[in-house]
């Protein structure tokens, strides 16, 4: 449990999360995949949480726009969702149970890329999980936008290898933040580890 860890150590842990959804409309669309990873403040992976495809009927998947239909078929998520027996409540409870082993409630910002969208979906479909996070976000896409404004050449070193599944997107986000830390850290006077 987190209580056994030194407070300083556990308070600096970061929870990375990614969702795949049927679309971007938070009122109409639904979460179909969730994954989490816990890192320390230096972005070293400490633990990989459960990765769930969330059960939805075929008619929900067929109602997705063309981009989502193609992407989720190509990644294999389409079939995983159809084969899954996991519901939102189960995925939420299991994810919280995993996080409780690593990070205290409210101690970590929500970390990832374009994380505000994930937070909106969690608020509606997994509210207990959304409340597990601190109200702040660590959004890697903010650094991407700043790099594009201030030093576009930094973006040349960003390599995405993801297959647009939740877990692979998390690892891409962590790698991207490592790249910005290395590239922008010296510019900002930060030590580069």
Swiss-Prot record:
Full protein name: Oligoribonuclease
Keyword terms: Cytoplasm, Exonuclease, Hydrolase, Nuclease
Function: 3'-to-5' exoribonuclease specific for small oligoribonucleotides.
Gene: orn
Family label: Belongs to the oligoribonuclease family.
InterPro entries to which the protein is assigned, alphabetical: Exonuclease_RNaseT/DNA_pol3, Oligoribonuclease, RNaseH-like_sf, RNaseH_sf
Organism: Xylella fastidiosa (strain Temecula1 / ATCC 700964)
Gene Ontology MF terms in the entry: 3'-5'-RNA exonuclease activity; nucleic acid binding
A GO biological-process term: DNA metabolic process
Domain of life the protein comes from: Bacteria
Active site: 135
Lineage, uppermost ranks: Bacteria, Pseudomonadati, Pseudomonadota, Gammaproteobacteria, Lysobacterales
Keyword Hydrolase: yes
UniProt-listed Enzyme Commission number(s): 3.1.15.-
Residues forming coiled coils: none
Pfam families with a match to the protein in the record: RNase_T
Subcellular location: Cytoplasm
Enzyme class per UniProt: hydrolase
Keyword flag Hydrolase: yes
Domain Exonuclease: 14-177
Annotated Gene Ontology cellular component terms: cytoplasm
């Amino acid at each position: 449990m987190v209580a056994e860890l030194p407070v300083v150590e556990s308070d600096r842990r970061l929870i990375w999360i990614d969702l795949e959804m049927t679309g971007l409309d938070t009122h109409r669309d639904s979460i179909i995949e969730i994954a989490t990873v816990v890192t320390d403040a230096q972005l070293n992976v400490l633990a990989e949480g459960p990765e769930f495809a969330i059960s939805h009927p075929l008619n929900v998947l067929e109602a997705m726009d063309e981009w989502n239909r193609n992407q989720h078929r190509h990644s294999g998520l389409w079939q995983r969702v159809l084969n899954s027996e996991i519901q939102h409540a189960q995925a939420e409870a299991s994810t919280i149970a995993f996080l409780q082993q690593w990070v205290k409630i409210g101690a970590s910002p929500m970390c990832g890329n374009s994380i505000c969208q994930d937070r909106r979906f969690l608020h509606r479909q997994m509210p207990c999980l959304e409340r597990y996070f601190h109200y702040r976000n660590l959004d890697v896409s903010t650094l991407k936008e700043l790099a594009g404004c201030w030093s576009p050449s930094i973006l040349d070193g960003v390599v995405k290898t993801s297959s647009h599944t939740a877990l692979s997107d998390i690892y891409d986000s962590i790698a991207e933040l490592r790249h910005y830390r290395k590239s922008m850290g010296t510019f900002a006077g930060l030590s580069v580890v």
